[in-house]
Design a protein with these regions (language model features):
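Non-catalytic, low-complexity flexible loops and terminal extensions
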Residues: 1-9, 102, 114, 118-122, ...
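Acyl-thioester-dependent acyl-group transfer interface
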Residues: 1-63, 71-98, 228-424
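Hydrophobic recognition helices of helix-based DNA-binding modules
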Residues: 127, 131, 225-230
Length: 424
């Protein structure tokens, strides 16, 4: 039952946004200006179609659980200085997401206990489709969008970790257990976001796999940019380590929209300034691909689940569990320098895609130096880089390094973003 938090979603209910990232944002841009009354109707239908997302946090004994959200839905203007900034604000009606808009752009901010980026983008696709349908645009669904006329089925709200119960798990054969370089944490509440675009049609010969596994190609380049700017003298014995959040659905198919990602770690062990790009790439691919085998992913997921269960199960007061979850987050963060999440290919019906010009997630950096999200949409790989320090400088160097290695990339946008707060 979806009122019981999923394994990977549970810790966020105990986590304070002052110490860890508990929310993400989905950004969608249309070719037409948004009308609030139509958007409200589409969203109202969506919360009935996706009841597993229409929940509020509640306390049962010494644990957090969910209860159906009973308040009124609301939509906000993104330029309103008085809009809600915290989950728990009464104007959100108890919901763990906020929908706002400005001109042609729509924003979905959501708490990570209810969904991951893939799950929330599925929800956002349905809202957008219904909005355009209600606006009078002729649309034809090809099966890639869940329609409001379809029926919720229980698998959409199941805990996807149940899929791994019978999967053999084993530690990867090739694994570099490196000490991660940790950078100074900044206390700023806002994030500076820079987006990078890589046209797939301009990828040179020999990079045919880039669009299928872009993180393999992007991680070593971003690690080099971080190393140059943050650790130019190369702290001996420490490495820039990427925490790669892997969407497990392609490996263990699940209909659930609830959190279903696990981290694997990629240490930057050969520098682009010392070896050719292809040599660095082969080394990184070997380390990463070993961790992306089904048994290795199951091992990573089960190890993460074990840490979560140790923190929130068993005896202890609610306050004690909050402290244990904080320690867990700190323990996991110590393994990496930055995080990168490959959400996947964003597929929309052709009749809808021509009306949706942009569609990507923004993941706050939280207790990491930077957080990257990677999606493929409309023939481009879109990388959003978030950070509290000089995101522009590291992203600019990232693009320079991509271009110098014959990967045609360009900086496309920069803005300030304030993630939603949450205080359990």
């Amino acid at each position: 039952m979806f009122l019981v938090p999923s394994v990977f979603g549970r810790p966020y209910l105990y986590s304070d946004s002052a110490t860890v990232s508990v929310s993400s944002r989905i950004v969608a841009a249309l070719t037409v200006h948004l009308q609030e009354n139509i958007l409200y109707q589409a969203l109202s239908e969506a919360v009935r179609r996706f009841p597993q997302l229409a929940v509020s946090p509640a306390v049962s004994g010494s644990e957090y659980c969910f209860q159906p959200a009973s308040g009124n839905l609301a939509i906000f203007r993104a330029d309103d200085p008085d809009q809600p900034e915290c989950f728990g604000d009464s104007r959100l009606g108890g919901y763990l997401f906020k929908v706002s808009y400005l001109h042609k752009t729509l924003f979905f901010d959501f708490h990570k206990s209810i969904a991951d980026e893939y799950g929330m983008m599925t929800f956002a696709k349905s809202v957008l489709y219904r909005y355009l349908e209600l606006s009078g645009f002729p649309l034809e669904n090809d099966g890639t969008v869940k329609l409001m006329s379809s029926t919720y089925f229980s698998a959409e709200g199941d805990d996807p970790m149940e899929k791994l119960a019978e999967i053999p798990a084993s530690r990867p054969v090739w694994y570099m257990d490196a000490e991660a370089l940790r950078l100074t944490q900044h206390s700023a509440e806002s994030e500076r976001v820079v987006t990078v675009r890589i046209p797939i049609s301009k990828l040179r010969s020999g990079l045919e796999q880039f669009s299928r596994t872009p993180v393999t190609y992007l991680a070593p380049v971003f690690s080099e940019a971080v190393s140059e700017l943050e650790d130019p003298s190369r702290d001996q014995g420490k490495y820039v380590v990427a925490s790669i959040m892997v969407n497990l659905r392609p490996y263990f198919p699940a209909a659930s929209l609830r959190p279903f990602c696990t981290p694997v770690y990629l240490a930057y062990n050969r520098r682009l300034t010392e070896y050719p790009y292809n040599t660095v790439l082969m080394s990184q691919k070997k380390l990463l691909e070993a961790q992306l085998k089904s048994d290795a992913l199951a091992y990573s997921a089960e190890r993460t689940a074990s840490l979560i269960e140790k923190a929130v199960d068993g005896a202890g007061t609610l306050e004690q569990k909050k402290n244990m979850v904080l320690e867990m987050h700190q323990q996991m963060a110590a393994h990496s320098t930055y995080s990168i999440c490959r959400v996947g290919n964003i597929i929309l019906p052709d009749s809808m895609q021509r009306l949706v010009t942009d569609f990507y997630p923004v993941i706050p950096s939280g207790n990491q130096a930077y957080a990257l999200s990677v999606v493929t949409y409309r023939g481009e790989i879109i990388v959003s880089v978030s950070g509290k320090s000089d995101t522009w400088a590291v992203t600019r160097r990232f693009v320079e390094l991509l271009n110098s290695n014959m990967i045609d990339a360009y900086l496309s946008d920069e803005y300030i973003f304030s993630p939603m707060n949450y205080h359990p």
